[in-house]
Amino acid sequence: MVVGAFPIAKLLYLGIRQISKPLANRIKAGARRSEFFRTYVCLPPAQVYHWVEMRSKMRIMGFRGAVIKPLNEDAAAELGAELLGEAIIFLIGGGCMVAEYSRQSANSHRKEEEMEARLGSMEAEIARLGLLTEELETRARVTERQQLAGK
């Protein structure tokens, strides 16, 4: 009985994706505590996200040109940390997808090369058998002529 190959790569990707959420939570907590991350990594994207979100909502509701107040520092740091965590999870998931795609592509390419090699050897065998058949036909004709000449 043949057992199929164990999908260790898929299991590994699943494990990485499961670990990404707690990892993102730790990075978010560190970003909230660190003044550098808070100021330069969390706040700017959060303010831009808030501005785009509020601008979109205002336009949908029909308020054009309304002034949008920036978030306070604590709210912006919290939103920025959440955005950072989601970006990390997204990047890890995307990386896993790209890795799985490249692995599948390499497997497919390898199988295709094996099939081409097998096809090439079969074609060579067919050509060899064709020559052998011609040689045997020639021998059969020679033998037949010799038998007819000997009678």
Curated annotation (Swiss-Prot):
Chain coiled-coil ranges: 106-131
Gene Ontology BP terms: regulation of lipid metabolic process
Pfam families given in the database record: OPA3
Highest taxon, organism lineage: Eukaryota
Keyword annotations of the record: Coiled coil, Mitochondrion
Localization in the cell: Mitochondrion
GO terms under cellular component: mitochondrion
Family per record: Belongs to the OPA3 family.
Function of the molecule: May play some role in mitochondrial processes.
Protein name: Optic atrophy 3 protein homolog
UniProt source species: Xenopus laevis (African clawed frog)
